[in-house]
């Protein structure tokens, strides 16, 4: 039994244009005999087909092909008219015996198949004389072989169209592995999924040009200087690139964002693994350039910039660092003793010079301790003035009692405190 094969309209032009069997023209009497037999049984057996072939003078294989084509036409017509296909009628008849092919015959057929997958009628008749098999069985053998092994055989017809077709100019159609690469935040090329294609089959617009631009990132001589060397900062703008950007349209891989460390943690308490995660963006504060975990330098912006800047690189190299005073700036005030008076704290605040313009700009977080900021807020004159009306709303008796308690418990000066300590 022949395996299902593509129709003549779907075969390549090379197979269709080769020497084919001449079309058989049926006479009216032959057509009537065939149709009468078809009405009785659409699926005649080998014995019925042989008797019909002898009666009308047509080879039995041609009678079998006629019944196959007639069943296909009737099935299409029943589907268009939404009628059920009756199927087999009567008892099933005997089928053709399976043709036994010897080893020598198979070797001859395989050699012919390797030379040509679509032999013409002349080649099939020659093989029939050499092997002793009927030509119709040889045709069925080639159909089954093409269906079971579509990639084998010689003189494979070239398929028209498609991205991975043969290269123009007579190039060999053997596939080649083309890998697209891109450059990420690490400054090195990463291979993308491989795509099998024939050489020269890719379009010259998008992927080929992009892969050519991304290829220099894979060269060792060009990738080596990118490690550990800081490039000059841009003259204008808030963006700085520590690694070459990927080409337009090149493949990319998503990377986890890199978050700055907690402002309250010191450098020793931070988790180096968590803070060292690679990421496409990094937040940095003004400061010197520091080398990344892998040795790639990331250049910080000039110290005149006070606002945080975003750069494509290894990650936050100096983000969340402790505040470092500039030249000529006073150090941050230290927290006063618990028993010091409010006037002493106000004097300390007045003695501190105003911060520079760079420090007055808003920052993501403050580097000063929270306790010191709370003391400064409570001791500020503006806060005391705003809180004075709340103190005056108390009852006169309570206000006098609080004033007497305040007069009895006056704060001790530094000399009195030292004298009290010496007496104790």
Curated annotation (Swiss-Prot):
Keywords: DNA-binding, Homeobox, Nucleus, Repeat, Transcription, Transcription regulation. InterPro entries: HD, Homeobox_regulator, Homeodomain-like_sf, HTH_motif. Residues 1-24, 72-102, 148-167, 218-362, 388-414 are annotated as: Disordered. It comes from Homo sapiens. This is Double homeobox protein 4-like protein 2. GO terms for cellular component: chromatin; nucleus. Residues 278-302, 319-329 have a biased composition (Low complexity). Residues 1-10 have a biased composition (Polar residues). Residues 19-78, 94-153 bind DNA. May be involved in transcriptional regulation. Its main location: nucleus. One of its GO terms (biological process) is regulation of transcription by RNA polymerase II. Residues 265-274 have a biased composition (Basic and acidic residues). One of its GO terms (molecular function) is DNA-binding transcription factor activity, RNA polymerase II-specific. The keyword Secreted does not apply. It is found in: Nucleus.
């Amino acid at each position: 039994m022949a395996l299902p094969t593509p129709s003549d309209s779907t075969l390549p032009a090379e197979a269709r244009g080769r020497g084919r069997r001449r079309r058989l023209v049926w006479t009216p009497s032959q057509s009537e005999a065939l149709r009468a037999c078809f009405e009785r049984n659409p699926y005649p057996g080998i014995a019925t087909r042989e008797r019909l072939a002898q009666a009308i003078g047509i080879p039995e294989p041609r009678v079998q092909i006629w019944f196959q084509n007639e069943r296909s036409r009737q099935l299409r017509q029943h589907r268009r008219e939404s009628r059920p296909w009756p199927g087999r009628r009567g008892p099933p008849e005997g089928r053709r015996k399976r043709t036994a092919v010897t080893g020598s015959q198979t070797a001859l057929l395989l050699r012919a198949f390797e030379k040509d997958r679509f032999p013409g009628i002349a080649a099939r008749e020659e093989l029939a004389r050499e092997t002793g098999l009927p030509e119709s069985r040889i045709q069925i053998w080639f159909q089954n072989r093409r269906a079971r092994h579509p990639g084998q055989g010689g003189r494979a017809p070239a398929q028209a169209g498609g991205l991975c077709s043969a290269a123009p100019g007579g190039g060999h159609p053997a596939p080649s592995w083309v890998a697209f690469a891109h450059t990420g935040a690490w400054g090195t090329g990463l291979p993308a999924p491989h795509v099998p294609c024939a050489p020269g089959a890719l379009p010259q617009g998008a992927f080929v040009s992009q892969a050519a631009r991304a290829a220099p990132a894979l060269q060792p001589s060009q990738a080596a200087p990118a490690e550990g060397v800081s490039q000059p900062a841009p003259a204008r703008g808030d963006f700085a690139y520590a690694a070459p950007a990927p080409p337009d349209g090149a493949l990319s891989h998503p990377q986890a964002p890199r978050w700055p460390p907690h402002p309250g943690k010191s450098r020793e308490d931070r988790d180096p693994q968590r803070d060292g995660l690679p990421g496409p963006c990094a937040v940095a504060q003004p400061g010197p350039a520091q080398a990344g975990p892998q040795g790639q330098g990331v250049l910080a912006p000039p110290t005149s910039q006070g606002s945080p800047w975003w750069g494509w690189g290894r990650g936050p190299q100096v983000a969340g660092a402790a505040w470092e005073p500039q030249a000529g700036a006073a150090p941050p005030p230290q927290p006063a003793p618990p028993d010091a008076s409010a006037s002493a704290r106000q004097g300390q605040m007045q003695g501190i010079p105003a911060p520079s313009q760079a420090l007055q700009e808003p920052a993501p977080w403050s580097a000063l301790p929270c306790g010191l900021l709370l003391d400064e807020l409570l001791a500020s004159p503006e806060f005391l003035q705003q809180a004075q009306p709340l103190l005056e709303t108390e009852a006169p008796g309570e206000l006098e009692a609080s004033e007497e308690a305040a007069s009895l418990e006056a704060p001790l000066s530094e000399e009195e405190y030292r004298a009290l300590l010496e007496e104790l």
